[in-house]
A protein has these predicted regions:
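Phosphate/NTP-binding elements of NTP-utilizing enzymes
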Residues: 1-221
């Protein structure tokens, strides 16, 4: 209503003129497996589709998934006032949930005592987290309205995975795209577990495991 690009009506303007998240009391996300059907299929079958490469159904699948990675995906996953409603995740979040592998705790191995907690790690697709739903929408809102964005984040909260996924998604979807990563020390970018390292891993995943092969990945200087 105030001239901002907010198609999902997720933002309010506060008394100070700043933006607030339009979170309604009692809202709850449900049926979130509908957001991750591509990831679930890959986890089960070790591939995203059974269609023959470059067949018409394969091309249609690729175009559909590229559209979702760019524009987002809507599904009946929001419970509000006792009624399940459609809600959209952003294209970046759709890509993150379905085409990004991250290191995470294998909950089947978790053990806790009064003194310590232990568990093994595994690589898998991210789980849907409601806080990240808002993170991705804030990022999209900033881009769509020409704003700069500073995120005050916690350490070890998965933001490097999120930003690397976003970078890789933009580079894979768009030709002649440039992404710049900056850090106080380059080891936070290029060393194993750094932002750029994660991004390269994501680009390699596109090239080797998905229908989105572009043949452009090289790490040669």
């Amino acid at each position: 209503d105030c001239g901002y690009n907010d198609p999902d009506d997720l933002f309010l303007i506060g008394e100070s003129g700043g933006f607030l998240l339009n979170i309604q009391p009692g809202d709850k996300f449900v049926n979130t497996h509908l957001f991750t059907e591509a990831a679930d299929f890959y986890r089960k079958n070790k591939q995203y589709t059974f269609y023959k490469v470059d067949s018409i159904p394969h091309r249609q699948f690729r175009k559909r998934e590229e559209y979702r990675r760019r524009h987002g995906f809507t599904a009946p996953c929001l419970l509000r006032n006792g009624v399940v409603q459609d809600v959209r995740i952003t294209g970046g979040m759709y890509n993150y949930l379905n085409y990004t592998m991250i290191e995470q705790l294998d909950t089947t191995t978790a053990k806790a005592t009064l003194k310590a907690s232990t568990g093994k790690k595994k690589y898998d697709f991210p789980k849907f987290i409601d806080a990240q739903f808002w993170t991705w929408h804030v990022m999209e809102f900033a881009v769509n309205n020409g704003f700069h964005l500073i995120i005050d984040k916690t350490r070890r909260g998965g933001f490097s995975y999120i930003m690397a996924s976003d970078t890789a998604n933009e580079l894979n979807l768009n030709s002649r795209k440039v992404a710049i990563h900056v850090a106080a020390d380059k080891k936070y970018l290029t060393a194993t577990g750094g932002l750029t390292d994660f991004t390269i891993n994501n680009l390699r995943f596109y090239e080797t495991k998905t229908p989105f092969v572009r043949g452009l990945l090289t790490t040669n200087a």
